[in-house]
Amino acid sequence: MLTKRIIPCLDVTDGRVKKGVNFVNLVDVGDPVAIARRYQEQGADELVFLDITATNQGRQATVDMVAAVSRQVFMPLTVGGGIRSVEDMRALLLAGADKVSLNSSAVADPDLISAGARLFGNQCFVTAIDVKTDPATGQKMVYTHGGTKPTGLEALAWAKQVVSLGSGELLVTSMDKDGTQDGYDTAFYKELTAAVDVPVIASGGAGKIDDFADVFLNSGVTGALAASVFHFQQLTIAQVKEDLIKKGVPVRWNQTLQRGS
């Protein structure tokens, strides 16, 4: 089994980290730079920075904020939100992002995936996919614009398409699970990871320490993203990693990791 990654996520709007349930009812969590520094100290493997209102407001993720965060952390930083061109990608990479993430713009212009992968390499290109269950059919469907717009795209088919276009990684969020803290949609991630040959990050639903081992041991995901459980300090990253090691899940470990907040 490959080494698994624990990845906190900063959902940022108006320069502040926010968190809600099912993509709504956002509450203020704090300053992005301070929170990023805390996760650096706790031993996060990567950090995801998503400007969650950039697309709806017709703007790019704040480059200055990305630069400020990148100066504080020494782990891979993935940035998404409002990216519409290769110039936007270049600006974020120059500001300190290690990877860029497309979501709504990838659906609007799939060729943007190929263009970004050709210019910057598929290793630094992530496609984020927000997935919600259709109550009528039970199918997993793709939504964009912060989960507000249905696309009519079936999730597995879209995942296969973006990989074929050059995406080097998938960040897949279960909208049904987002912020609920009742566990990842492990069955879906098992199906998804069997269908694609790139790393997949699971997102949405982490609430208790067992949830991380469950998704790693019962699906092929290589990373588990979480927000609420870390932001509100119900668990630390070090506590999660200690539990994973006990359960036979390989993770990066450093004896100096902070167990507290």
From Swiss-Prot:
GO cellular component: cytoplasm
Subcellular location, record wording: Cytoplasm
Main location: cytoplasm
Gene Ontology terms, MF aspect: imidazoleglycerol-phosphate synthase activity; lyase activity
Assigned keywords, A-Z: Amino-acid biosynthesis, Cytoplasm, Histidine biosynthesis, Lyase
Quaternary structure, from the entry: Heterodimer of HisH and HisF.
Protein family membership: Belongs to the HisA/HisF family.
Pathway: Amino-acid biosynthesis; L-histidine biosynthesis; L-histidine from 5-phospho-alpha-D-ribose 1-diphosphate: step 5/9
Source organism, top-level taxon: Bacteria
Organism: Limosilactobacillus fermentum (strain NBRC 3956 / LMG 18251) (Lactobacillus fermentum)
EC number, as in UniProt: 4.3.2.10
Cited function: IGPS catalyzes the conversion of PRFAR and glutamine to IGP, AICAR and glutamate. The HisF subunit catalyzes the cyclization activity that produces IGP and AICAR from PRFAR using the ammonia provided by the HisH subunit.
Annotated catalysed reactions: 5-[(5-phospho-1-deoxy-D-ribulos-1-ylimino)methylamino]-1-(5-phospho-beta-D-ribosyl)imidazole-4-carboxamide + L-glutamine = D-erythro-1-(imidazol-4-yl)glycerol 3-phosphate + 5-amino-1-(5-phospho-beta-D-ribosyl)imidazole-4-carboxamide + L-glutamate + H(+)
Active site per UniProt: 11, 130
One Pfam family per UniProt: His_biosynth
One example of a Gene Ontology biological process annotation: L-histidine biosynthetic process
SUPFAM superfamilies, alphabetized: Ribulose-phoshate binding barrel (SSF51366)
Protein name: Imidazole glycerol phosphate synthase subunit HisF
